[in-house]
Amino acid sequence: MIRARQSVQEIKEYVAGKNVEEVAASYGIDEKSIIKLASNESCLGASPLAIEAIRKAACDAHVYPSVDAIELREALAMRHGVPVRNIVCGNGMDAVIETLLRAFLETGDEVVIPLPAFSYYENVTRFCGATPKYCARRADFSLDVDAVLKQVTDRTKFIFITSPNNPTGNLTSLAEIRSVANAVDGIVFVDEAYIDFSGGKTALELMKECDNIVIGRTMSKAWGLAGMRIGYGFMPDWIFREYMKVATPFALSRIAIAAALAALKDEEHYNRTVETVKAERQFLMENVPFKVYPSEANFVLIDTAPLTSKHVVTEAMKRGVILRDCASFREMGDRYVRITVGTREQNVRLVEVLAEIKGSR
């Protein structure tokens, strides 16, 4: 019998958060009464301009999109002040990461991943035949640069730094990112999926002084287009050239490109989304009846001790609130839950549900 590659057999399937349909079926709850605060989706949804663009673009669904999403890359170049030749687009940031690693990793290479972190980094590393090397963040989940550098060897090809980090929500300073980039020969991938919600600076300015930094972005969060799967990345010329050799052609659909272009024109909706998240995040920080870690993202992390994360998440689902159990994140244990920032109405209900769960133990 033919078997999958050994490196694939070693991969654990990605575990996503529960969706509304699953919870409704499992607990006999009306779908309309369920609030999903598990997947870090936009609490205000997509821009009306993007929704209208999707409707119009659907009429041309039979026509191939541009091979490399050039029109979107040009729009992103204008927004961020980065040359088009240094921007790539993919079917979600996951695809950008996979393409990048596919271009550079070989069997025997190593990838350094500070934990806790998004599990897909590990999966795509193993898929490419490389070995993930882990290091722990500090007790407050800040990046330990010394711990990162201790894992670096002459086989290290990539180092992942997520800022703000998922699932902990904290930023990594530009000074820390610079320290890592200057100390290694490998590529430092800075995942900035949640940077829009932070008060910190993007690592874009570091690309002017470090030619081994790649920055990943997404339109799933602040732009409210998670269902369109639109990711993009900034990278220096020498990395871009190799990336494009293995990039999937026509990776973004015409509909996704149209939605992204329209969303980028709706600055008012974007700003309203970011400001709403910041205000509601503060509401959660002040009112959730468990320890809440400081966050610069559109989610907060809570410590459910002495209750287990599984207990809290299960009891919340029974009450129609979907949260993310962080036990699926390597080294997170069984006491952390990630909560997406919702609307005020959703957040008030969430706080009431958590108080009820905590009070009934």
Curated annotation (Swiss-Prot):
UniProt KW Endoplasmic reticulum keyword: no
Entry superkingdom: Archaea
Pathway entry: Amino-acid biosynthesis; L-histidine biosynthesis; L-histidine from 5-phospho-alpha-D-ribose 1-diphosphate: step 7/9
Cofactor(s) the protein requires to work: pyridoxal 5'-phosphate
InterPro entries: Aminotrans_II_pyridoxalP_BS, Aminotransferase_I/II_large, HisP_aminotrans, PyrdxlP-dep_Trfase, PyrdxlP-dep_Trfase_major, PyrdxlP-dep_Trfase_small
Annotated positions of the N6-(pyridoxal phosphate)lysine modification: 221
Segments traversing the membrane: none
Alphabetic keyword roster: Amino-acid biosynthesis, Aminotransferase, Histidine biosynthesis, Pyridoxal phosphate, Transferase
Catalytic activity: L-histidinol phosphate + 2-oxoglutarate = 3-(imidazol-4-yl)-2-oxopropyl phosphate + L-glutamate
Keyword Transferase: yes
GO biological process: L-histidine biosynthetic process
Enzyme Commission number: 2.6.1.9
GO molecular function terms noted in the UniProt entry: histidinol-phosphate transaminase activity; pyridoxal phosphate binding
Recorded family membership: Belongs to the class-II pyridoxal-phosphate-dependent aminotransferase family. Histidinol-phosphate aminotransferase subfamily.
NCBIfam families the record matches: hisC (TIGR01141)
Protein name from the UniProt record: Histidinol-phosphate aminotransferase
The organism of origin for this protein: Methanocella arvoryzae (strain DSM 22066 / NBRC 105507 / MRE50)
